[in-house]
Amino acid sequence: MSEQKIGKITQVIGPVVDVEFEPGQLPNILNACTVTNPGINDVPDNLVIEIAQHLGDNVCRCIAMDQTDGLVRGMVVRDTGLPITIPVGEGALGRIMNVVGRPVDGLGPIPAKTSMSIHRDAPLFTEQDTEVRVLETGIKVIDLLVPFPLGGKMGLFGGAGCGKTVIMMEMVNNIAMHHGGISVFCGVGERTREGNDLYNEMKESGVLPKAALVYGQMTEPPGARARVALTGLTAAEYFRDEEGQDVLFFVDNIFRFTQAGSEVSALLGRIPSAVGYQPTLATDLGALQERITSTNKGSITAVQCVYVPADDLTDPAPATTFAHLDGTVVLSRQISELGIYPAVDPLDSTSRILDPNVIGEEHYDVARGVQVSLQKYKDLQDIIAILGMDELSEEDQQLVSRARKIQRYLSQPFTVAEVFTGMPGKFVKVADTVQGFKEILEGKHDALNENSFYMVGSIDEAVAKDAASKA
């Protein structure tokens, strides 16, 4: 290895640090450099900074991956000669690491034999796998209307407080615990409490030994939040490429990745684009999303939460994310206001594999029947609000009655929400889900009270609940 390049800090502006190197000694862009920041702790080289720009006059502009309070001009900066590299493989399982691969769970160093750079190229077209298989989530509304492709990318879109994280936690619970393979959970700019809760839940349920957790939460500076998604993805890519595994990759929240990029972008002197986002929004997101794919070696099935600012799906951040996904689960505030959870909008959510050739004719027909019924009910709501139900034709009254039952049957108690609701969670198999909705559409349960369909698992539970209420 060539002689280590050493520079000195010339300027610190928030998370952006300017470093001057000797002439002809400039490190490459994206290289990681280290500096000792007494503001963090006394450990040498405790702060990692990543080179973002060469400004001229031997000065590099860098982005800090931790706090810069405590840095002063003239401090010595050492180039590592490599991009940020993290420990990967078996040693990383059951552990929590931060953006630069250092453990944050207080259990000592991560004993990994291999390390990888977080900046990698996406797989080639020739390496991509195109086989379509369905992943069962056990959540009725998703399995029926927005089937998940195994090895695909799904997004959970929703405004603040609509329940994105709860649905993702339920999926971690349902899929990771039934799946038996490797899971990687990446917390990007979200609440530290949620990360802590997930860690403890995984520990209690025994999934932790097969999971790697990578956190860069709200307290982290924007440099860490803009890179932690790449760190998590690199951990997942190792299991896919080197061990040929089918990996589950959960990200909460992709919007924070974009938000961190926009925070750093202005400090790097780029002129903001639409709504104040960075001009490189599509490129940054594309570089991340193109790496989340299935190859002929193994697969990555990704579930990504996407915060929707002010419930506006046309905002550049969620709108750019839409283009990369195989399916979108859109959460609606109107549905959550009705008390129906998960608050998935059955008419706004889409999946690429809602196709009779993939899921079968019966499932497809029932899903479309449910959507038609709910759409007609939506169209009639204004008339009902003004004139009342009695003014509708008999046929329309029957349609509305069934649609209201369907709407309530789309709700479901979750295992992860059991502590709040007091109701035990339900995992419903796809065949039972399809059968239940088919029976409602056919009118087999017209005599049942619509409230009997609220917060139950299978259709048999709704029938039993109705019988109990009449007893």
Curated annotation (Swiss-Prot):
UniProt topology in membrane: Peripheral membrane protein
Binding site residues for ATP: 158-165
Enzyme Commission code(s) on record: 7.1.2.2
GO cellular component: plasma membrane; proton-transporting ATP synthase complex
Function, in words: Produces ATP from ADP in the presence of a proton gradient across the membrane. The catalytic sites are hosted primarily by the beta subunits.
Subunit structure and binding partners: F-type ATPases have 2 components, CF(1) - the catalytic core - and CF(0) - the membrane proton channel. CF(1) has five subunits: alpha(3), beta(3), gamma(1), delta(1), epsilon(1). CF(0) has three main subunits: a(1), b(2) and c(9-12). The alpha and beta chains form an alternating ring which encloses part of the gamma chain. CF(1) is attached to CF(0) by a central stalk formed by the gamma and epsilon chains, while a peripheral stalk is formed by the delta and b chains.
Stated name of the protein: ATP synthase subunit beta
Annotated source species: Desulfotalea psychrophila (strain LSv54 / DSM 12343)
